[in-house]
């Protein structure tokens, strides 16, 4: 499905640009009101259906007539890089049932409620240790909160789950920063990807020689050795877990700080009463949809959705970012309110349905501990430049912050 010359005048290009540094594209509100399911043109001239209402987005996420397999004809890719990546061997996030759940269940035990609860003391220790280092080094000059805190927190925790030796943390964090912070070239990012894959392959080999009870060790022992998966699968799954949520988590920590600076009365409430933190985290993940371009599908057969006929082979992009600002589900959706009372399952920051983010509980635990500890340790933390001068990610990409200079 491609746009013709006449169509391009009326069919908008997607991804849309954010309305401002931190606000979702204005087009979403207009489409929710007037055309909840409409066509958009992608980078290569192909067309896809864009779904913007909460109810329809949830339907897309759970309809088995729609496929997550990126190799299917018509699957909507948003960039040339995405199109190239679609040729790689898939992991569970790009699989349909039953293969999806077969592979996902191999790593799920590491992200259960019990496992995350057991990790909380380690997360707390990691967060507090990084903040203590910041305090010890002082802030005569502004300190980049991303480099010194927001990036290492989620990195160190996922490395520990995977089983990365502590002495390699700095090297891996450096490679991860190159591939994810948007300031490196495409070539540098690709080279960093290769370095990470090579490193993980070496780790898989080590576990074959010396079994250990970490995530890579269990993948090797329970799946690779019995022949359920190949070595390349083990490497790709480890890579997915290493990088998938990392940039998103870094951004959510930084965005949480900025959002509190924009809402000083809520910041004061949060400092006075840490029991408000879980509600703050839920609202943060609704208000700023950290991963907003991942809910893509292709129709396996002709089907009807919201009164529109979707043909087999046509792509669908379900905007969880738009759904998180749906007036029918969240009154005054453009207002940040940490007292907002809603079912956490209605917040779509982590997706919806069988493909909902496997690490949601871990991510929320990390964010809760970060915001319980950050202002308790640095009560006078402030951004050292005007908020409208903060360097953000490009406006057609996921909302995020590149650098966040702070003092305290």
From Swiss-Prot:
GO terms for molecular function: heme binding; iron ion binding; monooxygenase activity; oxidoreductase activity, acting on paired donors, with incorporation or reduction of molecular oxygen. It comes from the Eukaryota. Keywords: Heme, Iron, Metal-binding, Monooxygenase, Oxidoreductase. Signal peptide: none annotated. InterPro entries: Cyt_P450, Cyt_P450_B, Cyt_P450_CS, Cyt_P450_sf. Pfam families: p450. Its cofactor is heme. Its EC number is 1.14.-.-. Heme binds at residue 357. PROSITE patterns: CYTOCHROME_P450. PANTHER family: P450, PUTATIVE (EUROFUNG)-RELATED (PTHR46696:SF6). Belongs to the cytochrome P450 family. This is Cytochrome P450 55A3. The gene is CYP55A3.
